[in-house]
Amino acid sequence: MQPTAPPRRRLLPLLLPQLLLFGLMAEAEPATETPGSASVDTVFTARAGAPVFLPGPAARPDVRAVRGWSVLAGACSPPVPEPVCLDDRECFTDVALDAACLRTARVAPLAIAELAERPDSTGDKEFVLADPHVSAQLGRNATGVLIAAAAEEDGGVYFLYDRLIGDAGDEETQLALTLQVATAGAQGAARDEEREPATGPTPGPPPHRTTTRAPPRRHGARFRVLPYHSHVYTPGDSFLLSVRLQSEFFDEAPFSASIDWYFLRTAGDCALIRIYETCIFHPEAPACLHPADAQCSFASPYRSETVYSRLYEQCRPDPAGRWPHECEGAAYAAPVAHLRPANNSVDLVFDDAPAAASGLYVFVLQYNGHVEAWDYSLVVTSDRLVRAVTDHTRPEAAAADAPEPGPPLTSEPAGAPTGPAPWLVVLVGALGLAGLVGIAALAVRVCARRASQKRTYDILNPFGPVYTSLPTNEPLDVVVPVSDDEFSLDEDSFADDDSDDDGPASNPPADAYDLAGAPEPTSGFARAPANGTRSSRSGFKVWFRDPPEDDAAPARAPAAPDYTVVAARLKSILR
């Protein structure tokens, strides 16, 4: 347990007469308080079987407050305050429990009340657990715990939680009263020890002087957090959840740090919430990732919700402790309406907190990548008040065939992002599918329309040069020479094959007719000039065989030319 704030000093003059009066009536003797006490205020010793009343400070009549009584007890011997030293510089008195007693330790609520801002009890709401043996009182006239007949198991630490709300500024105090019940055997032994004469101490050897070396210079930093472990609120309240971070630096080296707030929404049927400390330092351990009691325990931070996180890189130490606010860092805050970080970038501020904000809030501070400080605060409403303890052991791993426990079935916090409704998902999917089908149909129609409008042929010039022969019924005895540009006299295939003369070629025969020349009005064909020069022509020539001799068969009458082939080719071109 962490040290808590003592009661207000202005109430001490009023408490002293009440403590003396009730101490005499209950035969309870306040024991000597350990110096430096911060969390344990008074220790009472009572006889077994005698009535005991543990008084608490009365409520202020002019403010609105929430108060509650709880007791820390267990199967082991009743806890008692003991001195606790964090190091050689800081020591205080707190309740210490053995590791074997942690599983049986319990913080049981006794009573809780909400007091209105008026002098009388009108408007007060009080809830007291029905226990005929122990009765807790939170009235305006009497505040305390009344035990009809004290027993040994009634020993323990009784806490009075008091929080002022409204215009009082959310002031919180926690008073701890320790009760020790002495049995009859212990009382007889104490009386026998008082009757024995005191003997002087036996002188021993002279003390040996030893020289102590100065401790080595420390490096790094040290952090401490002192939050309240429980915070009871009413839906709609606005309050500050503070961890009271304390920082101490031993050198000037820059450092990196991170601040994380984790939230665990507790199940409604959990009677005890365990925080496994080993899982905070080893979040990736299999037992921490899959604990057996996942719904009622805080194991690995990876299993919880991150409500606020801030990362600092290359931060300079600040002796005044303002480094979380002065250093630059990247921050993340959960998008919830009722939660935001405080101005110091460490604490949390709740604005109009709803009932769904109840749960366990765990604070973790890392220094250069290592966890240096952590603690928790149980923020709940009065109807969901449960117990929370820190467990220093490893959690039990869930069975391999056991189903993964899910989060508790509770409503989401107000303003938290929620998933879309199933009907909305179906509607959006249907609209999207219809849109895709429409786009595909439109694309097919456009492509078909373009294909129907596109010409599958190119317009060719039907009047260009065509290399063909005139239709005739006679055997094809026509020689088509090359074009004029490639024509040479020394390569004339129509020259005499038996001629061995290498001189210039003779002029073409007189019977060669140029079909491409300009026609004459008398004969329709132009004879080639004698000098062999020709005007620009298409390059097509047709050579006809000489008329046969007289002994040959008479020539047949010329048939009409067949232009079907030419017409078919022209049609194919014009298509």
UniProtKB/Swiss-Prot annotation:
Span list, region Disordered: 186-218, 394-416, 491-560
Disulfide cysteine pairs (residue numbers): C270-C296, C279-C288, C315-C327
Keyword set, alphabetical order: Disulfide bond, Glycoprotein, Host cell junction, Host cell membrane, Host endosome, Host Golgi apparatus, Host membrane, Membrane, Signal, Transmembrane, Transmembrane helix, Viral envelope protein, Virion
Top-level taxon of the source organism: Viruses
Intervals, Virion surface compartment: 27-423
Region described as Interaction with gI: spans on this chain: 76-101
UniProt region (Acidic), positions on chain: 484-502
UniProt subcellular location: Virion membrane; Host cell membrane; Host cell junction; Host Golgi apparatus membrane
PTM comment text: Phosphorylated on serines within the acidic cluster. Phosphorylation determines whether endocytosed viral gE traffics to the trans-Golgi network or recycles to the cell membrane.
Matching InterPro entries: Herpes_gE_N (IPR046463), Herpes_glycopE_Fc (IPR003404), Ig-like_dom_sf (IPR036179), Ig-like_fold (IPR013783)
Glycan attachment sites: N141, N343
Family: Belongs to the alphaherpesvirinae glycoprotein E family.
Name used for this protein in its record: Envelope glycoprotein E
Organism: Bovine herpesvirus 1.2 (strain ST) (BoHV-1)
